[in-house]
Amino acid sequence: MNQLSDRLNRLSPSATLAMSQKSNELKAQGVDVINLSVGEPDFNTPDHIKEAAKKAVDDNFSRYSPVPGYPVLRNAIVAKLKNENGLDYTAAQISCANGAKQSVCNTIMALVNNGDEVIVPAPYWVSYPEMVKLADGTPVIITAGIDQDFKITPAQLEVAITPKTKALILCSPSNPTGSVYTKEELAGLAAVLAKHPQVYVIADEIYEHITYSGKHESIAQFPEIHDNVIIVNGVSKAYAMTGWRIGFIAGPEWIVKAVNKLQGQYTSGPCSVSQKAAEAAYTGTQTPVEEMRQAFQRRRDLIVKLAKEIPGFEVNNPQGAFYLFPKCDSFFGKSAGDRNINNADDLAMYLLEVGHVACVGGTSFGSPECIRMSYATSDENIIEAMRRIKEALALLK
């Protein structure tokens, strides 16, 4: 008998983690799989950050931390927001968590009531709608296709807002598309939101430092909506620290207090040693961040070039993050042997089993006509993966 809670039965498993698990199973059987499904940098954490963590261990810095994180880390985040983003916050407006994923979930759980609507632009990160459902809210999906560079318009946002709307989740740079909102585009959205002060913005900026066409722009910069914006960020992507699990929110103090209250009952403060590592990330040299960004840009250029050479792919040109999100519906209805391709998930599984390349079908991202490829891997892997994909797709008739 299934005695799980209704809220858990409503949740869908993570498609990205499922594909990664399937890829690892094939690897364990001796199959040479190139994994383009993973959403994390392939670089190592910079040395000065690791040294800070080692020192913390040697100094026995291993006690419970305050729920929102140590003041020294929160002050480092305040300085980062001022120096890099031109935004003014205090330490009381910062709450650190076990990764940006928890920060997003904390914020949704603190804001959303049963029946509240949360606008989620599609394509979206797979966990956004599930987190809204976990909070007994209703995800309202706005779809922006490749013809819009996967970015919603002010007109679309205006139509989606109702008296039940509580929040908008906005991810820029985007996972899964790599699209980046410009200052002008954000200003257009802010103008709409200013007319609806009951709507909060959860601004996921975890890929902030991985951009290829200029400075990152935050929607929190617009005074007319600043007090309704909750920034989510962290060290995972920019500093290659996915396993250290430090994220944060920056927002109105009353929301931060609510998040602290929630987190105090769930997980308490984040890992003390990881906080020292994150402090070193924010206060130390930023040279490794730029070096990784340049490598990602080179890989972006490479994978876009190779993907455009594959007949049947419609390819976007991502301006940030480390994902390509080609449209692949021209292959739907085709087959190779007993393998039929009806949707992007079928195509992703076909590429894994026949081409031995792991990608993620777009259905769980709200875009069933696309697949996501991560180029957080070596140039050699990208070249070989795209060769395999091209050969496997050529077999479909």
Regions found by a protein language model. Give the residues of each.
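PLP-dependent class I/II
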Residues: N2-L4, L8, S12-S14, M19, ...
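A glycine-/small-polar-enriched, mobile loop at the entrance of the PLP active site in fold-type I
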Residues: S37-E40, K55-L73
